[in-house]
Amino acid sequence: EASGGAVHAAPRTLCDQRFVGRLIWCHDPEGNRLEFFCDPEIATEPFTPGRAISGFKTGPFGMGHAVVKTPNVETLVPFYRDVLGFRVSDYALSPIPLFFFHVNDRHHSFAMVGSEARGLHHLMLEYCSLDDVGQGYDLAQLQEGRISQTLGRHTNDYMTSFYTHTPSGFFIESGHGGRLIDMDTWEPHETDCGPSFWGHERLYLSAEQRDTFRDMRLTLARDGKRAPDCPWFQAVTGAR
């Protein structure tokens, strides 16, 4: 409210639908609805997955991450950084604007990508086992057109993942091995190497756009760039 935005208290009916004690909501400058809650109801029954998996990495790291697409990155960054208090992890300006934010030790829990469109780009869920991701990839490939980005590994958070289309028009990223950082010592910085070491072929883009991302991956391969063998050592030494 101090920044000029309207904040609304949710009625009891909505709190009951969300299974939370209290809830407030507002819109970001792009009109995306944000909900904040406390006192969630805790399930007493153990989680039963839809297929045999080892589980999801959540707890103190949250559920994963969410990414929105926007034509006005410069408008959204101050809101999430200065109003909500999210901390910038890193950012890229080319070939498209990308900003990543952390709120805990997960490299990023929120991000935004420059786009002509607005709305949700994707949600990421992190599995406890790489085999969970690989087996899910096999299953997704049984459905024609389901894969939106092939299996690959990201350069900033080291996540090995693939992306799938959803009926609602956004993507789901299924990943493993995401990077943890030290919030007290981390310094935000610009990256220019591209989003992936290998893979993540964006099947939904034009041939020209795909060539741009592929050239960046091939440059990394030529230069011998890869994720560190020991992310913990990298974290404590401050190397990137």
PLM segments and residue spans:
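Vicinal oxygen chelate
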Residues: 1-30, 70-74, 125-240
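Intrinsic, low-complexity N-terminal interaction/targeting segments
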Residues: 12-13, 32, 44, 108-111, ...
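Generic structural signal for well-ordered beta-strand positions
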Residues: 34, 89, 172-173
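Long C-terminal interaction/binding lobes of large macromolecular proteins
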Residues: 117
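Core segments of cupin and vicinal oxygen chelate
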Residues: 68-108, 113
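Structured, non-catalytic alpha/beta "coupling" segments that mediate domain-domain communication
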Residues: 28-38
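Surface-exposed beta-loop interaction hotspot
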Residues: 28, 42-73
